Amino acid sequence: MANKSIYVTMPTLAPLEEVTQLMQGIWERGIMTHNGPLVQRFEKEVADYLHLRNIVSVTNGTIAIHMAIRALGLKGEIITTPFTFIATISSIIWEGCTPVFVDIDPDTLNMDPSKIEEKLTEHTCAILPVHVFGNPCEVEQIDAIAKKHNLRVIYDAAHAVGVNYKGRSIFEYGDISTTSFHATKMLNTAEGGACFSLDDELHEKLKRLRFFGFDDRKDVVDDGTN
């Protein structure tokens, strides 16, 4: 029997002629970066599809987590899961915080909320769960624990584009949700990611962080990225 690769996932590709038409428009406009017309169209269509008003698209899902941590000004220990892609953990470390692992529920593979409080210390600043394989975390329990202990919540929703929980987008929970548009994800742009927040002030800060920290007047007011 000949060896045949079995792929976990494969990207869905648009017809080449459609991509070529979009590329032609980019060449004609000469706008290659920094929130061009196609980025704005993409953000609007994703927001409309998810019934959300705030989206900040970025280069990938990893930088989305970086920006979420930076936007919330987190310092100290972040409760997270050991069952995730390395980018979740490396983002915490790159932002100068310390990951503290809480074990998972063997049935859902998500963080077990009943084990969070035993890991809290005076240095804990946030909880960063992952919706593993698009299966929603126990968001109500996690958000309640965070509120009780005055912690922030970032959900890594890299697998969860389009997921609803009790009639609401899963991106509506926590302070910020991040996602990925990597080629292996449900919605792919080859590379890409986004941050979502219902908090308008956080949304504006995330927009500044995405563009080098510039505000609308082009004054640098935050330590941004690109």
What are these regions (language model features)?
Residues 1-31, 226:
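N-terminal "arm"/small-domain region of PLP-dependent enzymes with the aminotransferase-like
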Residues 5, 27, 160-166, 173-226:
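Active-site region of PLP-dependent enzymes
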Residues 31-77, 83, 91-94, 100-103, ...:
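Phosphate-binding glycine-rich loop
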Residues 44, 66, 140-143, 191:
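Active-site phosphate/pyrophosphate- and oxyanion-stabilizing loops and adjacent acidic/basic residues
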Residues 60, 104, 132, 183, ...:
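Short, conserved catalytic or interaction motifs in soluble domains
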